[in-house]
Amino acid sequence: VTKAALPALKKSKGRVITIASAAAIGRTAYNWLPYVAAKSALLAMSKNLAQELGPHGVTVNSISPSMVDTDLVSNIPERMRQMTVSRTPLRRLATADDVAGAALMLASPYASFITGENMLVTGGEHMI
C-alpha cells in the first residue's frame, strides 16, 4: 500500500504510520515467532522508509502498543491479561482509543519533525 501511495505522499509531504507491537521489542510468550518476526520486520521497514522518504518531507513512524483490550485478545486467558496489567504502571490494558490518540498525534503538524521513531503505547510496561 505504501509503495502505491508514494507519488501522492511525496507530493503532499504526507505521513506513514505503521502499527507494530511491543512484542517486537521485548520478551514474548511461547509460540509467537511468526507474529514477532512480522512486527519486527515492520519496524525495520518503517525506519528504512523514514530514511528514504525523509528528503521528500514524508515522515514515517511506528506505534507499538502492548496488549490492547479488544475482541482480538478476548481468547487470551484472564490470568495472562492480569499479569500484563500488573506489570503496567497505569494498571490497565491499552484501549483502541489509546492507540488512535498516538496515531492522531503522529499525523498532526505537532509531529512534523518526528520520523523513524517507534512510539510505545504500553502504559509504561516497556519503559526504555
What residue ranges belong to the model's regions?
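Active-site loop-to-helix junction immediately N-terminal to the catalytic Tyr of the SDR YXXXK motif
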Residues: T28-V36, N48
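Short, small/polar-rich loop/turn modules that mediate ligand/substrate recognition or access, typified
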Residues: K13, G54, T59, I114-G116
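Alpha-helical segment proximal to the catalytic Tyr-Lys
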Residues: P7, Q51-P55, S112
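Active-site helix of classical SDR
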Residues: T2, A38, S46
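Residue(s) in the substrate-gating loop at a strand-loop-helix junction
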Residues: S21
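A conserved structural motif in NAD(P)-dependent oxidoreductases
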Residues: T88-V99
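Short, flexible catalytic-loop segment of classical short-chain dehydrogenase/reductase
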Residues: I25, V60, S64-N75
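Short C-terminal tail/terminal secondary-structure segment
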Residues: G26, L104, T115-I128
